[in-house]
């Protein structure tokens, strides 16, 4: 996820994906900022938005929707209502990283994440892609370990960051929900283990 936990984050050079805090696994150089017309800030305290059935029909679909909704070129507003439609009431987004050698986390609501990360995602451009996933399911409870790459432009040759999203999901019998997204960026002293870089089976 884009991470509003650092002065420079996955979401912008200051995080999903932390944009105002100091937890950043890798600190990429601040990208040139696009000259955008004023974008509408994310709304808060809105009525729940009905999900697109295609977004919540399967585990694959809801994880794909999560990555898609935060991704886009510079100056393109993100659909935060769609983002909210993916998560349960009370969902949490939890970026983690290290400052002064100590692990630090920040627990956010979906609205807090949208407010913290939205401007940087939209100003700088941000594309996050899943490259590997492992998971387990018991009854209605599913845990997915989703490895990601982050780019400023969709066609950038190399990602500026990688990491793992630990995604907790629930299936209520009619649709899938995201309960928690807890993530950490890769660091030079903490590379992603090989078992979490295996491409998905076809």
Where in this protein do the model-derived segments appear?
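Surface-exposed, charged secondary-structure patches
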Residues: 28-29, 92-93, 97-156
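Bacterial N-terminal signal peptides
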Residues: 11-20
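Bacterial N-terminal signal peptides that target proteins for export
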Residues: 2-11
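Sec/Tat signal peptide C-region and signal peptidase I cleavage site
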Residues: 21-25
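Short beta-strand edge/turn micro-motifs at domain boundaries
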Residues: 28-40, 162-192
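Early exported N-terminus immediately downstream of N-terminal targeting peptides
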Residues: 75-80, 84-102
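Short, low-complexity N-terminal intrinsically disordered segments enriched in polar/charged residues
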Residues: 26-85, 197-201
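Hydrophobic pocket/interface hotspot
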Residues: 66, 83, 91, 144, ...
């Amino acid at each position: 996820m884009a991470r509003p936990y650092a002065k420079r984050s996955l979401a912008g050079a200051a995080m999903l994906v932390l944009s105002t805090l100091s937890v950043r696994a890798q600190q990429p150089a601040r990208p040139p900022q696009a000259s955008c017309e004023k974008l509408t800030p994310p709304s808060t305290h809105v009525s729940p938005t009905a999900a697109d059935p295609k977004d919540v029909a399967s585990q694959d679909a809801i994880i794909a929707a999560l990555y898609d909704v935060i991704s886009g070129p510079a100056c393109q507003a993100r659909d935060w209502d769609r983002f909210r439609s993916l998560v349960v009431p009370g969902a949490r987004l939890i970026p983690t990283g290290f400052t002064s050698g100590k692990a630090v986390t920040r627990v956010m609501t979906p609205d807090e994440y949208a407010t913290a990360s939205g401007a940087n995602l939209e100003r700088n451009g941000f594309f996050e892609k899943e490259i590997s996933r492992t998971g387990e399911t018991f009854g209605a409870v599913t845990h997915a370990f989703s490895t990601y790459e982050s780019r400023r432009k969709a066609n950038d040759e190399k990602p500026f960051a990688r990491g793992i999203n630990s995604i907790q999901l629930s299936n209520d019998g009619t649709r899938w929900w995201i309960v928690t997204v807890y993530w950490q960026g890769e660091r030079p002293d903490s590379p992603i283990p090989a078992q979490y870089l295996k491409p998905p089976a076809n």
